[in-house]
Amino acid sequence: MPGVARPPLPLLSLPLLLLLLLLPRAGRPLDLADYTYDLGEEDAPELLNYKDPCKAAAFLGDIALDEEDLRAFQVQQAAVLRQQTARRPSIKAAGNSSALGGQGTSGQPQRESRGRWRGRPRSRRAATSRPERVWPDGVIPFVIGGNFTGSQRAVFRQAMRHWEKHTCVTFLERTDEDSYIVFTYRPCGCCSYVGRRGGGPQAISIGKNCDKFGIVVHELGHVIGFWHEHTRPDRDRHVSIVRENIQPGQEYNFLKMEVQEVESLGETYDFDSIMHYARNTFSRGIFLDTIVPKYEVNGVKPSIGQRTRLSKGDIAQARKLYKCPACGETLQDSTGNFSSPEYPNGYSAHMHCVWRISVTPGEKIILNFTSMDLYRSRLCWYDYVEVRDGFWRKAPLRGRFCGGKLPEPIVSTDSRLWVEFRSSSNWVGKGFFAVYEAICGGDVKKDNGHIQSPNYPDDYRPSKVCIWRIQVSEGFHVGLTFQSFEIERHDSCAYDYLEVRDGHSESSNLIGRYCGYEKPDDIKSTSSRLWLKFVSDGSINKAGFAVNFFKEVDECSRPNRGGCEQRCLNTLGSYKCSCDPGYELAPDKRRCEAACGGFLTKLNGSITSPGWPKEYPPNKNCIWQLVAPTQYRISLQFDFFETEGNDVCKYDFVEVRSGLTADSKLHGKFCGSEKPEVITSQYNNMRVEFKSDNTVSKKGFKAHFFSDKDECSKDNGGCQQDCVNTFGSYECQCRSGFVLHDNKHDCKEAGCEHKVTSTSGTITSPNWPDKYPSKKECTWAISSTPGHRVKLTFVEMDIESQPECAYDHLEVFDGRDAKAPVLGRFCGSKKPEPVLATGNRMFLRFYSDNSVQRKGFQASHSTECGGQVRADVKTKDLYSHAQFGDNNYPGGVDCEWVIVAEEGYGVELVFQTFEVEEETDCGYDYIELFDGYDSTAPRLGRYCGSGPPEEVYSAGDSVLVKFHSDDTISKKGFHLRYTSTKFQDTLHSRK
């Protein structure tokens, strides 16, 4: 599991340092190679320079160590190190590649280390002797890189708010601070430096599969100043290290710190710490323990390695490390209250309390004191409550209060308030009581900032109306970029929405009304003002939105045109260089060089990636524009294809469009090693774009193109209904309910019985989209994968209307034929709600009489997992997903099946195939079995990994099968068979 160690800022033990000092890189001076330059957003021209943990001098699990500490220790401990070497001759030199060596590249969250130590030892200091590693005033500025999705950004913010909620640490969007953290996606997976490094930005790498809440909380623990709990000097009294089960080369991750090197701040060993390794971290096998607790707590062996939330020990140590006041807290709810200690019974002397009120950016805080009874003094010198307009003690003072007079309500200018209470005497008065409330919207007069929906990154609240009026400096425009967007979807955004207008009022020109899950494009006002309105109704709530605003500058109007050699294009918040035809940007993104790609008018030919057949170079962007004569179509066939693979083709890819511009109809975006199918243009032109990033290079692609006359483009090829162009010819086709005439051009009515076995598709009335014929009866028998219910969703409906649908109608049955129960009879023009079968079969029957004809209907059929199924003596099948065997299971799935046998019988489950993402505690993807109808029944087991579990027998007449998958790695899934059985006394399960 990605690790965080809780002893704040301890350093390395001598056995560990021996390994470090023997590395061949020990003498390398720190240079610019230790820094990574990241564009953030794809076209950003300014480079972001940060301290890269993936290029650290050495690693301890997921902890990055820099050379400053290693050099210092090398000087101070040389003599002691020689003595330690003599006592422990069995330790191998780090230069031996079979034990220790160069940098690995694992990005898996359960594998925190790249598996190697590099560099020199860390200086030997206690936590309290390194105050520069503690963030001043507990304020940690941050930047989130541009390569993360909206959901990932939300996870990062939730993790930061989790630390803020329980400690006095504050995470703040960076403005002009020199030292700050940068969330990046780096090849080393999950890793971070411990504490503040100073002197500039430092990265926290959230690589592949690291974007889980608990893992991010853990990595932030390193940033705050914690090491792994199991490295404490007293750990041998609490846990045993099972060294024979540790992966070869990973033993150093279990070395123990010396007493002089660790400051545990007086806290006891914490099995529950989020900074503790799990039982099988770096294990040779998933069921082999590497760390085992030595004793029981409350009668059971404690579990270790949780990645769910901060433990009480984590919170206590963080509060001690950052010297949090003994009373007070961080308040994050939209409404709340707080009071002086022991209110209303009087407070004690020498009290110091701090309350940090933090609501969503874009909201303001109204603070009301409802009771005030403090010792009164001149200038409130002795006892007072102080309110500051911001996140810390140096924020602008809004008032210092004492005595008995109630202050006027205070409204913050931003989303944070700092409230501090101090007492110097024992006062018999009540103290004070205050309430606060978050209000959204208002006037925002500044040149840059952030606005988020109420309660972001959690779901926004119902029945909210928020209006923001943004104003930047005169002479500038307002730029708006969306970081995250998820608002209840509706075709016309009638329920929940964000509305943007180009001005300062509701009567200004409408730029757009937005909802759904796609981030809107960047927005630029025509003046220095912009108007935003967010509305939510009383029902469905989503994660909402996060948007940045800023004053927009035209960098291309400067004398040097942004340093561009040929062309400068102003973009929102930035600019980019471009080149004249025949040229392309060089790797520095400013100069131009001879381009790949080109404008091709030949009827046939070939194109290849740059450098073919060798690996293509980094940072290339090639565009081919293919043009054929009118009435021709262009086909593209790939002979070889190999690019850097990614689920969303984000890095290297080939993009094919019908048309010549970047917004033409997209045929596909391709990457990886699978050759795309033949692609045929919609018109007489095609655009092929190849793009590579600055990292992994592959062999690329080779493709040939050819042009063919489209006979269908003129008079529909003489076809009565549909004409389909083929290479060198064409063919006529008929719509649903018709067959092709012997003349191969006309269509005649035919039988209208259909058997549908695909997991998804479209069903239409005969002759759609034209009017259906009279006196027609059509049926569709839909069957899907066992365990998956058929769902029918209507796209369009226009059938002759009648109150009882007695004339023309569509009837839907819950089963294999018209004898099954009726799910609905439909007619008219109102689109019905989706129809869901109880099983994997659905039967449709369409009927038209001899009078009125309409357009008909169009519907899509799909599947939904789960439901109740019946077990009997005949063996039946159940599959994890409808496309089992063809595709891996999808992400973000939660399915529940209840398998019920007749009374007096049990249920037997036998897995035929089982392949689910593997994780120590089966916390990501898993199947879970319960001996009953719901999850309150006894659990039979939770399973993940590969290889089918043993047979499972229920003790009662039902079994609940739950299947969960997250949104990252997917596998083949499972296939199980179930039957009813009399043998209920045997239960096989494996947890």
UniProtKB/Swiss-Prot annotation:
Activity regulation statement: Activity is increased by the procollagen C-endopeptidase enhancer protein.
Tissue expression: At high levels in embryonic maternal deciduum and floor plate region of the neural tube. Less in developing membranous and endochondral bone, submucosa of intestine, dermis of skin and the mesenchyme of spleen and lung.
Propeptide positions: 26-125
The enzyme's E.C. designation: 3.4.24.19
Glycosylation sites: N96, N147, N337, N368, N604
Disulfide bond entries: C168-C324, C188-C210, C190-C191, C327-C353, C380-C402, C440-C466, C493-C515, C556-C568, C564-C577, C579-C592, C596-C622, C649-C671, C712-C723, C719-C732, C734-C747, C752-C778, C805-C827, C865-C895, C922-C944
Region: Disordered, residue numbers: 86-131
Keywords annotated in UniProt: Calcium, Chondrogenesis, Cleavage on pair of basic residues, Cytokine, Developmental protein, Differentiation, Disulfide bond, EGF-like domain, Extracellular matrix, Glycoprotein, Golgi apparatus, Growth factor, Hydrolase, Metal-binding, Metalloprotease, Methylation, Osteogenesis, Protease, Repeat, Secreted, Signal, Zinc, Zymogen
Bias-annotated ranges (Basic residues): 116-127
Binding site for Zn(2+): H218, H222, H228
Matches recorded under InterPro entries: BMP_1/tolloid-like, CUB_dom, EGF-like_Ca-bd_dom, EGF-like_dom, EGF-type_Asp/Asn_hydroxyl_site, EGF_Ca-bd_CS, MetalloPept_cat_dom_sf, NOTCH1_EGF-like
Gene Ontology annotations for the cellular component aspect, listed alphabetically: collagen-containing extracellular matrix; extracellular space; Golgi apparatus; vesicle
Domain CUB: 327-439, 440-551, 596-707, 752-864, 865-981
Phenotype caused by lack of the gene: Deletion mice are perinatally lethal, with the most obvious gross abnormality being failure of ventral body wall closure, and persistent herniation of the gut. This phenotype likely reflects the defective and weakened nature of extracellular matrix (ECM) in these embryos. Double knockout mice (BMP1 and TLL1) display progressive defects in teeth and bone development.
Cofactor note: Binds 1 zinc ion per subunit.
Subcellular location: Golgi apparatus, trans-Golgi network; Secreted, Extracellular space, Extracellular matrix; Secreted
Source organism, top-level taxon: Eukaryota
GO-annotated molecular function: calcium ion binding; cytokine activity; growth factor activity; identical protein binding; metalloendopeptidase activity; peptidase activity; zinc ion binding
Residue ranges annotated for the Peptidase M12A domain, each copy included: 126-325
Biased composition (Polar residues): 95-110
SUPFAM superfamilies recorded: EGF/Laminin, Metalloproteases ('zincins'), catalytic domain, Spermadhesin, CUB domain
GO BP annotations listed: cartilage development; cell differentiation; ossification; positive regulation of cartilage development; proteolysis
Protein name: Bone morphogenetic protein 1
Gene behind the chain: Bmp1
